[in-house]
Amino acid sequence: MEEDDMILFPVLAFLIGVIAGLRALVAPAALSWAAWFGWLHVADSWLAFLGWGVTPWLLTLLALAELVADQLPATPSRKVPLQFGTRLVSGAVCGAALMMALDLNAVGLSRAEMATEGLVAGLLGAVAGTLGGAGVREWLAARFRRDSPAGLLEDAAAILGALGIVSAVA
């Protein structure tokens, strides 16, 4: 474990929270695949379900449904309580998963301390991603004079960002 990892992982936990703020299910789907492939070591934790055989497939299907639903005009704002809360929970859980992937012996923190640090970083990232993503999308939609191109760009940013974070962990 290098000292840089002690800085990198909280940043990644924050960033996966941002991704969850953009798309609530893209972040857990990406981390679930990372756990399934053995890149994210959460098998001996309360997040072991992320690596179970069916979980990545299920989360991927749900993420795809979210991407489709987001393009529909009747989809509620991400800032309504249920949508906002879902993104916060997703960001917090994903942040915890990233932090718990660290080599605990090298860091000198307990699993609970790592999970708490990840929960907080992911939660803050989710707030930033939810509110910032909404603002950027509104700005882009005004420039495009339509919402769908802005939504597709946001989808691409969420997917590519999640892949980048997973590749940094792998």
Annotated model-derived regions:
Residues 64-80, 131-143:
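C-terminal ends of transmembrane helices
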Residues 89-97, 118-135:
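Mid-bilayer segments of alpha-helical transmembrane spans in multi-pass integral membrane proteins
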Residues 152-169:
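Final/C-terminal transmembrane alpha-helix of multipass membrane proteins
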